[in-house]
């Protein structure tokens, strides 16, 4: 019995030159899809196109564009349809961040992260829907994060952007359902992933930035995006047991999680190596303009290539059971590590 494979589709991916977006390009290419790959860095884009062609893409084109520019995004969507045909799937993955305490982030930096990591999703989804809705078909996949539910220290700008995406996506999904269209939008909440962003992110930390363990390979994330594109009726997917644990712990005991992250969230986001003073910085200019970093970061030896939770979550109804089991393990552990402080004695009235 042969495996069912969908007919080749036209797929647009933002942030496609590295990390999760790059891995998504390879995954869709292996299905024989037609790909429009959007990013700012020329070398990274060229590498992504060559990799997609080797993986089996029917056709792959590189489009240099900044998702913070709505006109550039609209032009990219127009070119994708002119060269590849009607867009069937649009994947939003482009983002930027700043690793620093909130008081050390400038207004310009905060605005830039918000424009790329939140408004970039808004502009790109708008460009996709302007084409999908008149045809009555199409899927938009938003690459999210556990940080969409649970902000973490040293990433206030990125945490705010991911929370904004979550609220906007929920509202948009309701509107699409109310309209009766077959166009769907779904979200994939990611764990920590081994991507190049930790080498090129703007950082004021004393040591090199790293994803909070456990770390997963970008191919895990790409498989989840591929599955979500094929099954967009579900509002969102959670990837990795750590994502499930974070979301459940935050829902059940957010105060405990505050204290836990206050104790662990600073060291866990840094390696033991000092941060290089002359490292690349992609906040305002692409770090991969002249160098192709690929999909993987520097944490291959630590990263996991499989996610048993992800495989289980594809089965209907299993996510709730997994969440209940995870909550049973996580909450007692948080309480042991972060005992509540004894409240001060109440004062009577004079």
Segment roles from a protein language model:
Residues 145:
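Residue(s) in the substrate-gating loop at a strand-loop-helix junction
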Residues 65-75, 107:
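The beta1-alpha1 cofactor-binding region of Rossmann-like NAD(H)/NADP(H)-dependent oxidoreductases
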């Amino acid at each position: 019995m042969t495996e069912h494979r969908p007919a080749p589709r036209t797929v647009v991916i933002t942030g496609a030159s590295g990390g999760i977006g790059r891995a998504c390009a390879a995954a869709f290419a292996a299905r024989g899809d037609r790909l429009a790959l959007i990013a700012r860095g020329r070398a990274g884009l060229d590498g992504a196109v060559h990799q997609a062609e080797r993986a089996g893409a029917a056709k792959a084109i590189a489009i240099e564009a900044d998702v913070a520019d709505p006109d550039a995004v609209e032009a990219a969507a127009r070119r994708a349809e002119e060269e590849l045909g009607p867009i069937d799937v649009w994947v939003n993955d482009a983002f930027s961040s700043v690793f620093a305490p909130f008081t050390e982030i400038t207004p310009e930096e905060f605005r830039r992260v918000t424009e790329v990591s939140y408004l970039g999703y808004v502009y790109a989804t708008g460009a996709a829907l302007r084409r999908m809705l008149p045809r009555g078909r199409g899927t938009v996949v938003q690459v999210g994060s556990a940080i969409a539910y649970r902000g973490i220290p040293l990433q206030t700008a990125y945490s705010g952007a991911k929370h904004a995406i979550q609220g906007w996506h929920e509202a948009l999904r309701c509107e699409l359902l109310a309209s009766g269209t077959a166009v769907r939008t779904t979200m994939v909440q990611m764990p920590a992933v081994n991507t190049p962003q930790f080498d090129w992110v703007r950082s004021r930390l004393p040591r090199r930035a790293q994803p909070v363990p456990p770390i997963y390979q970008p191919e895990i994330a790409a498989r989840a995006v591929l599955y979500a594109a094929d099954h967009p009726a579900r509002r969102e997917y959670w990837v990795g047991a750590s994502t499930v644990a974070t979301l459940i712990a935050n829902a059940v005991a957010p105060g405990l999680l505050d204290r836990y992250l206050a104790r662990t969230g600073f060291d866990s986001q840094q390696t033991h190596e000092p941060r290089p003073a002359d490292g690349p910085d992609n906040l305002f200019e692409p770090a991969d303009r002249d160098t192709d970093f690929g999909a993987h970061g520097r944490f291959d030896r630590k990263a996991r290539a499989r996610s048993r939770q992800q495989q289980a979550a594809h089965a209907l109804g299993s996510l709730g059971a997994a969440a209940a089991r995870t909550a049973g393990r996580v909450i007692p552990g948080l309480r042991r590590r972060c005992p509540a402080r004894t409240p001060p004695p109440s004062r009577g009235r004079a």
